[in-house]
Amino acid sequence: MLDTANKKLLGRIILTALVVVTLIVAPYTLTDPMGLPKLSMLAFFAVVALSLVLPAIKALFRSEFRTLVILLTLFILQIILVLFLSGADLGAQFYGAYTRNNGALAYFALAVLLFSSSLVSDKEFVKRFIRIVLIIGAILIIYGNIQYLGLEPFPYKTLYTVNAPIGTFGNSNFQSAFMGLIATVAMTMALNTAFKVLVRLGFATMGLASIVVIYETLSSQGYLNFLAGLALVAILWLIIHGRKTLAMAAAGLALMGGGLVFLALFNLGPLARFIFEASVASRLYYWWAAAKMLIDHPFFGVGMDGYGTWYLRYREAAMNKGFSTYTNSAHNVFADIATSGGVVLVTIYCAIAVLVILSIVRIIRRKDGFDPYFLATVGAWFAWHVQSFVSINQLGLAIWGWLLSGLIIGYEINTRVKETGQVLPTKIKHTGKKAKVSVQLLSSKSIISLFAGVLIGALIAIPPYYVHARFFTALYSSDLKAVESATYLRPIDERRLSHGASMFIGNERQSEAIAILRDGTARYPDSHDLWSIWAGIQAASASDIATARAQMRRLDPFNPGWK
């Protein structure tokens, strides 16, 4: 097991990772200023955390954490199998789709951070966590209002509503969902009668401010996950205070409300006129396409983050027009995981969620009294999962769901251990009248492991960021030689190849564009972007155009433009 020094450092790493991954953006260095920097930081902190955990992994397999260790090990092993057996490009699977970055690296990092958070979770750490949550929430409430007022300091462009807050997530739906989570935490903290009235009013005000930002986003996701999270908190509060009849009644009302919301997704029931809209309708098509992918690829899916590569082949013919013509996500985290890694991967993911639920039940049964910090954590976890049913796994949000899961599982285990007296006592050094807690330093073995973790983490995190930053600089320099050089920097990815080819086409250098497209389609034969660009080049040979159009008919069979 981890010693005190390692555990404290691991806790700091987790909290730092949460802050950095949520807030980091890179607007002046990348064409993808939101997704890629979050992936780089997520990977870096996960590897550093792993360097502290790995030396104790054998002991953890024999500890109370063994169920979680086994589930996460199976999850990672299935991802490794998918990488080699799904048939998709290894590089594309490792880093994930452009702007989404939900590849093997991201899920490995999320799994490591979930486990790490479970090791450090206890009553004191959960308090620290909730305080950090509220600070991040306050930052994004302020930033969201700055964006709403048209005072955005960064040169972002959105395809959605003008001035709708996007926070540090790149999409108003994500900002809305995150504000729903923050509102849940703030309102739960306001329930604590141990706080002074002014403090409780402050929490309630923060919750209301979060709801105001949800309104500004013009996205209903935040309302739904806030109501769901707060409803669960209210039910658990009633159970804790012995009001089981009221709790059952509240649970019944919550289930009825949830059922009406579910019907509204299909344009049915009294709530349909408030919830159902074009973007909701399109999600039904996305989910149906995901289901068909899973049926045809049940064991290893279509490859990590490969939904976009296959979507056009599985979409309904009715979806060949409008903004929903193409998507690279099922807009449902469970469906995205299922299509990425098959039935096994999504089953393990569901098993982790079940383990969280069992942990919540066990803690509530202990009748330890009202702990607002724990209930806020549970409410936030449930709010996150509600939004995950209709949203994309944006890494700035994804880290919250995985860390919250680890915190709840670890809280149950670590407080259980403490109750049975199995926790090692803190070493106390008595000097005179006052007792001083001795400071434990990292062992030499831990320092070496940590140094290796920082080095390896940097080696994994920096390359994708570096090559995309070089490409961004080359694009804005209009130096075609620099563009060509940056296009082929490793790790190579499909989007840089398509951007590079488009740059040459725009400068009437079609032969160079064709050379890039030839290389690109050899590496990514299922790339819709590369083949469609090639099919539109007038200087291409008739046979090349015919080949490109034939490939587009294969990749986009319901598009009448390729008939």
List each language-model region with its residue ranges.
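A juxtamembrane structural motif centered on a specific transmembrane helix
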Residues: 1-3, 193, 367-370, 405-465
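Alpha-helical transmembrane segments of multi-pass inner-membrane proteins
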Residues: 2-28, 41-54, 72-76, 80, ...
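Short, hydrophobic transmembrane alpha-helix segments
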Residues: 25-39, 56-61
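Transmembrane alpha-helix boundary signature
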Residues: 52-63, 80-95, 148-152, 418
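TM-adjacent membrane-interface loops and short helices in multi-pass inner/ER membrane proteins
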Residues: 117, 171, 284-327, 334-337, ...
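Flexible juxtamembrane loops connecting transmembrane helices in multi-pass membrane enzymes
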Residues: 164-168, 226-230, 256-295, 325, ...
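Hydrophobic alpha-helical transmembrane segments in integral membrane proteins
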Residues: 265-278, 443-481, 495
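C-terminal luminal/periplasmic domains and tails of membrane-associated envelope-modifying transferases
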Residues: 443, 451-453, 475-563
